[in-house]
């Protein structure tokens, strides 16, 4: 069997699947580990460089919860119904 173009056509099985912890397509089925977050190790895998850390830090995704919290904090949590009821009691 040759080791060139002909053998590359046979590489059609998938080795990676979605990771349970980080959700990326980097969980290797044969190695049973995620190349992105290090799952199943209890500690998260540390990205090597500062640039890589910047890519995956807080503020790079959708930030559904944080966006709402930052806006509410800026306005003094005036629109929060739970806090409004607490202030009404006092």
From Swiss-Prot:
The keyword Cytoplasm does not apply. One of its GO terms (molecular function) is zinc ion binding. Keywords: Metal-binding, Ribonucleoprotein, Ribosomal protein, RNA-binding, rRNA-binding, Zinc, Zinc-finger. Gene3D superfamilies: 2.20.25.30. It comes from the Eukaryota. Binds 1 zinc ion per subunit. Its cofactor is Zn(2+). Zn(2+) binds at residues 19, 22, 34, 37. GO terms for cellular component: cytosolic large ribosomal subunit. InterPro entries: Ribosomal_eL37, Ribosomal_eL37/eL43, Ribosomal_zn-bd. Residues 21-31 have a biased composition (Basic residues). GO terms for biological process: translation. Residues 21-59 are annotated as: Disordered. A zinc finger (C4-type) spans 19-37. Pfam families: Ribosomal_L37e. Binds to the 23S rRNA. Belongs to the eukaryotic ribosomal protein eL37 family. This is Large ribosomal subunit protein eL37. It comes from Encephalitozoon cuniculi (strain GB-M1) (Microsporidian parasite).
């Amino acid at each position: 069997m040759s080791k060139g173009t002909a053998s590359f056509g046979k590489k059609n099985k998938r080795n990676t699947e979605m990771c349970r912890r980080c959700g990326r397509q980097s969980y290797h089925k044969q190695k049973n580990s995620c190349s992105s977050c290090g799952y199943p190790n209890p500690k998260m895998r540390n990205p090597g460089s500062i640039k890589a850390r910047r890519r995956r830090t807080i503020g790079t995704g959708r930030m559904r919860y944080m966006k709402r919290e930052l806006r509410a904090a800026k306005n003094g949590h005036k629109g929060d119904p739970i806090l409004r009821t607490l202030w009404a009691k006092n």
